[in-house]
């Protein structure tokens, strides 16, 4: 078992591995769903991908700007490493500070943090740090939120929120994308609440769903089309969970999905209209030993299907984390190309990390 601040991640049995990055193919399906292809882009393990980066350990969250490359939260090394859609590593890499690394210790003297969720900030006025605009914002298991401002410090994010004293453990991060007056949402797994911050990093309120069983905690979070989706899971247990929908003001709307198809659900993404039979669905990644990506009707929550390979077998990725689509350019990929991060591996490779992409193969690859 590998753990971070109380969250334990079980190692898979050696027999579960039949392909790279812990890829497992299970079961058969109708031909209509058997048309997706996965491609490893970067790994910190040799022979796993064409590009190798030792810092890509327990790759967790991922984010991009409209034309910017992909930024990855490397949870086990405390860095954010950056890659284009082909997996080519960019020269810049950014250290994520841990609790206590404020303005008095700007060089990270307390060591690196444990980044989880990451978001792109498109506002030049919201979420400034020390008067400088920030571009990417990170949450950590240490209970901190840091922002990267190239004008302030190009090589390290700057601490903006430190809630380590209240034992906060932020497992996910979401942001609004309005012209102004934006909010940031951090999923506090320990205190089972969503901390909502304004554009000055001030806490507005904490919210959640009091009707969720008490053994479930907030885990993943995503702002999609003006609504905040929150995934609840039972820490260290496995199958079963909930996905709630809230307004951007933190008002509960409904429980959209619940049941055994959610297994440590964390990543969420809205599929575009050209993603094959799973087009226009809500995709949800399961961060389990046998992690899958399931698709649901975004309005009713009805199960639609699971991403499967060309032969009709379910694509399974051990300890799957983030999922997000490209922006429609060569830097961060096609709008129907799904990029994923895979975290901990198995056995001796518990600190593995992989950045990969999935395309609907019937269309001849990404468009």
What is each residue range found by the language model?
Residues 4, 29-31:
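Glycine-centered signal
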Residues 1-13:
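N-terminal secretory signal peptides that target proteins for export/translocation
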Residues 14-27:
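Bacterial N-terminal signal peptides
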Residues 1, 18-20, 41, 268:
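Generic low-polarity alpha-helical segments
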């Amino acid at each position: 078992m590998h753990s971070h601040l109380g969250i334990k991640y079980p190692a898979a049995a050696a027999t579960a591995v039949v392909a790279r990055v812990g890829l497992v193919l299970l079961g058969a399906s109708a031909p209509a769903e058997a048309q997706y292809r996965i491609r490893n882009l970067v790994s910190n393990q040799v022979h796993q991908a064409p590009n190798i980066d030792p810092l890509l350990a327990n790759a967790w969250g991922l984010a991009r700007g409209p034309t910017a490359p992909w930024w990855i939260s490397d949870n086990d090394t405390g860095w954010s490493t950056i890659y284009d859609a082909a997996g080519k590593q960019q020269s810049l890499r950014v250290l994520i500070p841990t609790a206590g690394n404020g303005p008095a210790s700007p060089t990270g003297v307390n060591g690196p943090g444990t980044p989880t969720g990451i978001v792109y900030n498109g506002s030049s006025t919201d979420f400034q740090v020390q008067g400088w605009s920030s571009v990417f914002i990170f949450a950590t298991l240490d209970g901190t939120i840091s922002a990267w401002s190239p004008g302030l410090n190009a090589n390290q994010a700057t601490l903006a929120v430190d809630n380590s004293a209240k034992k906060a453990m932020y497992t996910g991060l979401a942001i609004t994308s309005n012209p102004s007056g934006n909010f940031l949402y951090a999923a506090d797994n320990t205190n089972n609440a969503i901390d909502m911050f304004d554009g000055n990093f001030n806490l507005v309120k904490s919210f959640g769903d009091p009707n969720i069983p008490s053994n479930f905690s907030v885990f993943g979070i995503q702002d999609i089309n003006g609504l905040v989706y929150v995934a609840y899971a039972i820490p260290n247990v496995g199958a079963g969970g909930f996905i709630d929908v809230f307004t951007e003001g933190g008002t509960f709307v409904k429980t959209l999905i619940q049941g055994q198809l959610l297994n440590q659900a964390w990543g969420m993404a809205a599929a575009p209209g050209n993603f094959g039979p799973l087009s226009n669905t809500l995709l949800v990644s399961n961060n389990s030993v046998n992690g899958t990506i399931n698709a649901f009707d975004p309005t009713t929550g009805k199960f639609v299907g699971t991403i499967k390979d060309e032969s009709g077998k379910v694509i399974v990725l051990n300890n799957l984390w983030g999922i997000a689509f490209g922006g429609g350019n060569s830097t961060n990929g096609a709008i129907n190309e799904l990029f994923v991060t895979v975290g901990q591996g198995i056995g001796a490779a518990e600190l593995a990390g992989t950045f990969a992409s999935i395309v609907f193969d019937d269309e001849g690859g990404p468009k």
